[in-house]
Amino acid sequence: PLGLLICFGRMSKNPAIRGIVSAYISVMRGTPLMLQLMVVYFGPYFIFGIRISMGYSLIAVFIAFSINYAAYFAEIYRGGIESISAGQYEAAKILGYSKAQTFFRIILPQVIKRILPSVTNEVITLVKDTSLAFVVAVSEMFTIAKQIASAQTTMMPFVIAAVFYFVFNLL
């Protein structure tokens, strides 16, 4: 949903909105996710002097992942919408459809069909990127596997984590 909203901002006829959203997308896609996690986690403290609570690390991970992946999804959605030929819009107008009806009944179903492979790839990448959450002290599966492996001097926790990531991405 956030990616679609950003997509509409990127496609806006208003140059100010389009420029701001384009800059946001460029920053999110042009900087590492790990850096974004650190900025979202440490930013409130260093910029505003707000104390970081114990539960904030998970919230920071959700915020950073949401704003990062929304930019990627926005570009996927934009590519899908712009790939629909002008004839589709013209046909809907001739049939008397409103702009909303045109989008939801004609354009969106075609867009979904076209973008589904790209969206699936991004979701797989998102699942794998969750291992970066350790940067802000969120114990996710890879961090726990690393702790167990170092305590037991065995590779099995890494193998189990790899199998889990692989199986989860098959779904």
Model feature map: region roles:
Residues 1-171:
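Transmembrane alpha-helices and adjacent helix-loop boundaries
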